[in-house]
């Protein structure tokens, strides 16, 4: 429904039709249970379209919009009012606009468009484009892979492109130029940090954001689409980027922030907050569940669900994305309530995906930073959740060093059994680093101590789920970041020169090799793990040689599964987190031989056991196919 609203351009007629929808809780009570009326007297539109030759706004003469009842064609129900106006034909170009809203008993407000497709250059204006190139997103080459087959690269568009951007190039164009390097690394999916428009200051030097303070859910940020050499190509750059990803077999996952909105001052905050005379009456905003952040969206009300659902469907259908990461879903989820919030939203999205023949679409949660997120993933029908204990425990073992050196502890066994408790068809997103926390290499002590990270890299790519790395991790970026405060969300441009020198070259090769091994062996993507259910008071290997030897900083585990051709693959993984070479012995079920995949050395058992020496801060992946 909401995809029909906004500033929609008829490229043949060169006109734009503005449509602003306001639900009516009195005449359409199904739209919301909590909230009041907007108390709007009338709505006008102002913008650079008023004087297209000079792109001047005429605030003294706002263009009055016509109000009429809106009946949803999907169900024939009255939903509220729509305010509309169609312009005369306009010259090609990029135009900006806002709604001028007068209330019954409050000062008028200039408010941005909640359904605009473009963010503006300043003051959180909305935008539209007349003319320019037309692009249709090309589908993914081949077929969309099951989630566990993905190797994900988390990409922050600004930091990724800042130091390699050409003068007359939009940041989204720069990403396209770097895609082949990511393919060489071995990933097959990119999770883009939010590209939707956020609230920003007028000072161009202060409009940096990670994107987790959204205001317009249908809109791509002007910062990412701006090419100084042309004004008519904007959204086309995002479409081309997704097409170029798809041409290379790269899945595109959108990071969606649907828990909250930024209610900055009226002229630039979340429109559906400020479209109400008393913003407290907005049915779109309210504390639905725990974890209030900015202004929480109120999923107790149908209008909120429909707005966010339709925004998701817009990105799915029009931009052909392959998955959505749902940021901070704590505020969208009430345990036991399947009729509202996250369960209802995902149910309606799954229904749409089924109707449109859209298989293997990823629905990924960021929920609790503990194992309780697994049960929520199962309960709401998501594909995956970010399994943050994988990061937090790895960070702790690497960096805390109570005795002066990295020390693993028995809870690592539950961490490595990352696929545990997920329903069939669901799996974790595993990582040792992401945008939200300090760099893993920094925790190691900096790039000089890169070798300390090696057993964790081996673990990540031999665990169940879809492994994720954060941009720059592949060559050992080690910039610091506080966990909170003003120095947290600031630019941290990637230094691509680090990829051309040591230790960046070696670190890159470690990640590339482990990704290659994972792609070549489907059984590593299964959930099978031994020893499962490890007693976390036990710091000794079991009688078969598996588990953790805390005193020697050694871990041994077994993974297995089908190779995709009906053959059994077995993997025996040994991780040495210590500063000395360690001798390890563990049982295997046959006479071998076994290939150690990191070195390609062939070893054979003796008396039913493999006896191996593993170098310090290193590991072994012993493989045999039946």
What residues fall within each predicted segment?
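Non-catalytic, glycine-rich low-complexity segments
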Residues: 1-38, 141-142
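Aromatic-rich carbohydrate-binding modules that target alpha-glucans
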Residues: 20-92, 102-124
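N-terminal carbohydrate-binding accessory modules
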Residues: 23-25, 121-154, 167, 198-205
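Active-site-proximal helices and loops of the catalytic beta/alpha 8
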Residues: 40, 212-213, 248, 317, ...
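Substrate-binding/active-site clefts of carbohydrate-active enzymes
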Residues: 143-144, 156-323, 328-358, 362, ...
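Asparagine-centered strand-capping/turn motif at beta-strand->loop junctions
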Residues: 574-578
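C-terminal beta-strand-rich structural cap/linker in extracellular carbohydrate-active enzymes
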Residues: 606-626
């Amino acid at each position: 429904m909401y995809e029909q609203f906004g500033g929609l351009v008829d490229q043949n007629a060169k006109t734009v039709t503005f449509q602003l929808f306001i639900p009516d809780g009195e005449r359409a009570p199904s739209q919301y249970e909590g909230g009041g009326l907007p108390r709007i007297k009338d709505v006008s539109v102002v913008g650079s379209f008023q004087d297209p030759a000079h792109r001047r706004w005429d605030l003294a003469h706002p263009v009055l919009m016509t109000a009429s009842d809106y009946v949803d064609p999907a169900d024939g129900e009255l939903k509220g009012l729509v305010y509309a106006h169609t312009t005369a034909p306009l010259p090609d170009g990029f135009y900006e606009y806002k709604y001028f809203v007068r209330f019954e008993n409050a000062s008028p407000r200039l408010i941005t468009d909640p359904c605009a497709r473009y963010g503006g250059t300043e003051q959180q204006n909305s935008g539209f484009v007349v003319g320019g190139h037309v692009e249709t997103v090309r589908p993914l080459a081949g077929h969309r892979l099951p989630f566990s087959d993905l190797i994900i690269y988390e990409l922050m568009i600004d930091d990724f492109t800042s130091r390699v951007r050409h003068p007359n190039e939009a940041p989204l164009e720069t990403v396209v130029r770097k895609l082949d390097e990511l393919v060489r690394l071995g990933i097959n999916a990119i999770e883009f940090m939010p590209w939707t428009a956020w609230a920003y200051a007028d000072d161009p030097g202060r409009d940096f954001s990670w994107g987790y303070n959204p205001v317009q859910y249908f809109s791509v940020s002007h910062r990412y689409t701006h090419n100084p050499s042309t004004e008519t190509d904007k959204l086309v750059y995002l479409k081309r980027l997704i097409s170029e990803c798809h041409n290379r077999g790269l899945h595109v996952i959108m990071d969606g922030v649907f828990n909250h909105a930024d209610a900055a001052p009226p002229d630039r905050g979340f429109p559906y907050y400020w479209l109400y005379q008393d913003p407290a009456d907005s049915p779109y905003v309210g504390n639905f569940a725990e974890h209030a952040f900015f202004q929480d969206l109120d999923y107790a009300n149908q209008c909120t669900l429909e707005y966010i659902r339709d925004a998701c469907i817009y990105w799915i259908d029009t931009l052909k994305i392959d998955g959505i990461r749902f940021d901070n879903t704590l505020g969208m989820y009430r345990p036991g309530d399947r009729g509202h919030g996250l369960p209802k939203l995902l149910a309606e999205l799954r229904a749409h995906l089924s109707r449109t023949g859209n298989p293997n679409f990823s629905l990924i949660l960021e929920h609790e930073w503990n194992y309780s997120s697994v049960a929520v993933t199962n309960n709401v029908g998501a594909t995956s959740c970010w399994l943050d204990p994988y990061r937090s425990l790895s960070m702790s073992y690497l960096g805390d060093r109570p005795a002066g050196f990295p020390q693993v502890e028995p809870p690592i066994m539950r961490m490595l059994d990352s696929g545990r408790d997920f329903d069939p068809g669901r799996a974790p997103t595993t990582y040792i680093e992401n945008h939200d926390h300090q760099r893993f290499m920094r925790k190691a002590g900096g790039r000089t101590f890169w070798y300390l990270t090696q057993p964790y890299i081996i673990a990540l790519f031999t665990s169940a789920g879809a492994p994720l790395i954060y941009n720059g991790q592949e060559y050992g970026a080690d910039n610091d970041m506080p966990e909170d405060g003003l120095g947290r969300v600031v630019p941290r441009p990637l230094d691509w020169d680090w990829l051309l020198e040591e230790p960046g070259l070696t670190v890159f090769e470690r990640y590339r090799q482990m990704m290659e091994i994972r792609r070549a062996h489907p059984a590593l993507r299964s959930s099978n793990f031994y020893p499962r259910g490890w007693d976390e008071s036990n710091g000794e290997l079991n009688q078969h040689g598996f588990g953790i030897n805390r005193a020697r900083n050694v871990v041994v585990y077994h993974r297995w599964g089908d190779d995709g051709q009906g053959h059994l693959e077995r993997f025996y993984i040994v991780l040495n987190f210590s500063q000395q070479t360690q001798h390890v012995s563990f049982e295997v079920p046959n006479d071998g031989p076994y290939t150690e995949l990191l070195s390609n050395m062939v070893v054979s058992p003796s008396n039913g056991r493999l006896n191996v020496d593993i170098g310090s801060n290193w590991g072994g992946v012993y493989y045999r196919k039946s």
